[in-house]
Every structure is written in structure tokens, then in C-alpha cells.
Amino acid sequence: MAKAVGSAGILVKESALLLHPELLSRDFLLLSLERRNIPVEDALNNKEKLTEIFVQHAMPLPQRDLPRNRWGRMMESKRGENKIATVLKSAGTEGGRKRPPIVFDGCSTSTTIKVKRTENGDASQRLNPSPKESTNSTQNSNPAPRLGSPTPNKEAKVATTGNHGQLDSLPVTDSALVSPKSAKLQQSMIINAVKLKRNAPKEEFDVANDTKPTEAKKKIQHVTWP
């Protein structure tokens, strides 16, 4: 191994000089820092600052020395294989890339908006329907019942209450065959039947409410203390 003389006049190895920058001269420190492109404008004449910069940026990191036995040789071979594998892998990934990497440079930020078509038609047709479709939709949403003009060849049974609460059915035929007086009578009968049907549950509910308190009173047992 080659040996060199430091600033203190001590014979040391070249590798040890890098680990002990205080033994190096100012010119050597400046040269080594300039080769590593480290700016040293503020510490040109100050060796202490140069040594601090060298320790911070240029001093090699400590590495473990493997023993000279079978295990050490095996680990050295593994380290070499790992380094070769990483180099080959990086070269293969760069060469086998299907497409170049995407770089966002600010110029490719303009995008266009695409409207997806539906099965029934374009989105514009769905947003702006034709007048026929709009009229059909309004008719379907707001159907107007017509009492005076029922459909022909169809009979509707009208419920009427009797003495025992039984319902009789009366057929209602076309409006052309029915006189206006009979039509008014039928309408009044329909209204009365609807009122009776609506009032019946209320009466039953009142009867049920009248029976419930008596049953609750019967269940209450008064406790007497001795």
C-alpha cells in the first residue's frame, strides 16, 4: 500500500487520509471538493471550515470489512451478484418499456369533454325531447278522469248499502242511453256509498276504544298493605 505524509508529518495510508481529513493539506481539500462540484467560496482560507465541508459532503461512509474465511468470501460473491442483477434489471426495464414515461410539462393540460351515448339515443335528445313526447308525458303524468263519458261495452258496479249493510250492484251503461236525471241519481248514490264506507271504520274504532278501558280496569288489581 502506498503511504503519504500528512500536514502533521505522520506516515499514514492513502485510504486513512480520507477518513481523517484533519491530516490533509488545504490544497488537497480544495482540490477534492472542487472535483465533487462542492462550492467552497466562503472557506477558501479557513482550513477548519474546509474540513467540516469535507466531512459533511465528501467523506466516504464506513463499510464493514468481511472476515477472510468461507462465509466472508460467500458474502462478497453475493454482493457482486446483487450489483450485477440490479444493473441488468434497470437496463431491461428502460429498454423494454412499451411507451415513454408521461411528462406533465404544462402544455398538455387542454382536454376535451366527450358525451357518452345512451341506448335510447343521444343525451341532447334526452334533455330536449320532441313536442309529441312532451305532450304524451304530460298526459300520462296528469290523467284527467271523465265522469260523463265512460268507455262503451264496459259496466261499472255501484255499491249501495241496505238494511243489513249488504251491497247491491247496479250497472252503469253508456251516457248516451242514460237520462240526465238518472245520471244525477247515480252520482249521488255513489257519493253516499263512499261516505258510508269512510265512516264505518271510525265507528268501529270508537267501539274498540270504548271496550279497551273497561278491560284495562278489570286487569288492575288494587294492592293493600297490612
Curated annotation (Swiss-Prot):
The organism of origin for this protein: Xenopus laevis
Region Disordered, annotated ranges: 89-171, 205-226
Tissue distribution: Expressed in the neural plate and later in the embryonic brain, eyes, and spinal cord.
Annotated GO CC locations: nucleus; tRNA-splicing ligase complex
Swiss-Prot/TrEMBL keywords: Developmental protein, Nucleus
Comp. bias intervals (Polar residues): 121-143
UniProt-listed InterPro entries: Ashwin
Name this polypeptide is given: Ashwin
Listed transmembrane segments: none
Pfam family, one: Ashwin
Entry's family note: Belongs to the ashwin family.
Task of the protein: May regulate cell survival and anterior-posterior patterning.
GO biological process: anterior/posterior pattern specification; convergent extension involved in gastrulation; embryonic morphogenesis; regulation of apoptotic process; Spemann organizer formation at the dorsal lip of the blastopore
Location in the cell: Nucleus
